[in-house]
A protein has these predicted regions:
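Catalytic core of Fe(II)/2-oxoglutarate
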Residues: 174-177, 181-259
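Catalytic core of non-heme Fe(II) oxygenases with the double-stranded beta-helix
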Residues: 98-106, 115-211
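Short beta-strand segments enriched in hydrophobic/aromatic residues
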Residues: 40, 163, 239-241
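Aromatic-acidic/polar surface patches that form glycan- and anion
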Residues: 37, 41, 107-110, 152, ...
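A generic secondary-structure signal for well-formed alpha-helical elements
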Residues: 56-60, 122-125, 243
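Non-heme Fe(II)-dependent double-stranded beta-helix
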Residues: 2-24, 29, 38-113
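Hydrophobic residues positioned within well-ordered beta-strands of beta-sheet architectures
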Residues: 36, 157-159, 233-235
């Protein structure tokens, strides 16, 4: 197993330093998003990109239509209501099972100093891997024309690493604090404005090797279609606040094509 210092640029990102952690937490709490530029070392980034290319043949590809809330359609409302309007998402994915045992991704995911940093910034007591064999580390591929449609997350946070930028497109866009899920305030009017292009959205600039923490439960967000021949590659590091949690079998079939 590689030392963490071979994977993370600890000079630029001193994840064990309390002041650095506090600064990161303040940024995330204020903006709902945190980008740490050059988080991965150049060597780790190159290795992960190569692993992604070598295992791309094992990716499960799926395209789906869904509403922004990622919920079943509400038959009591019109089809053109914000609650029911459909958007498209399409991508490929390899699962934790395809990530090599010696991958820098696995070392990073399992590293206690990294988890301690995440807990401090996200205000979580502990973070645990998924109990199933597929969900903890995923690498997503978006080829030309593939995109992630507008949606809200069901989870309170997302942790990602951009591994390969496309030639164009593949932009992450979001509107923060558009709903209040805990209070059941869905803000249908605001969602309609975003879907109709009548409301300003924020781009979240990220480069290859950057770590991104994002709170997407109340922030509507999307990734625009990939343009050009270079595939967008993004790693998702998924943790749970409780132990022994597995993604449901139905969700695994939807996301991975198997259980």
């Amino acid at each position: 197993m590689q030392p963490l210092a071979h994977i993370v640029d600890l000079t630029a990102n001193p994840i064990g330093d309390p002041a650095f952690r506090a600064q990161c937490k303040t940024t995330l709490d204020t903006a709902g998003a945190l980008v740490l530029p050059g988080f991965l070392t150049a060597a780790a980034l190159a290795t992960i990109r190569l692993e992604g290319a070598e295992h791309s043949h094992a990716a499960f590809y799926a395209a789906s239509k869904h509403n922004v809330y990622l919920r079943p359609q509400d038959e009591t409302l019109p089809a053109d209501h914000a609650r029911n309007r459909l958007v498209v998402s399409s991508k490929g994915c390899i699962t934790d099972e395809e990530i090599p045992p010696q991958s820098p991704l696995r070392t990073l995911y399992d590293a206690q100093p990294f988890r301690d940093f995440l807990c401090a910034v996200l205000e979580e007591q502990c973070l645990y891997p998924y109990a199933d064999r597929l969900s903890s580390i995923n690498l997503h591929y978006a080829h030309r024309g593939q995109e992630l449609g507008w949606h809200f997350d069901n989870s309170s946070f997302a942790i990602t690493l951009l591994i390969q930028k496309p030639q164009a497109g593949g932009r992450f866009e979001y509107v923060e604090n558009l709903r209040d899920a805990d209070r059941g305030e869905m803000n249908y009017a605001g969602v309609s404005q975003v879907l109709d292009g009548e409301r300003a959205v924020k781009p979240l600039a990220m480069e290859e090797g950057d770590l991104v923490l994002f709170r997407g439960r109340n922030a509507m967000h999307r990734v625009t279609p990939t343009e050009g021949d270079i595939t967008r590659m993004l790693v998702v590091l998924a943790y749970n606040a409780q132990p022994d949690i597995a993604l449901s079998e139905s969700a695994r079939m939807t996301f991975y094509g198997r259980v």
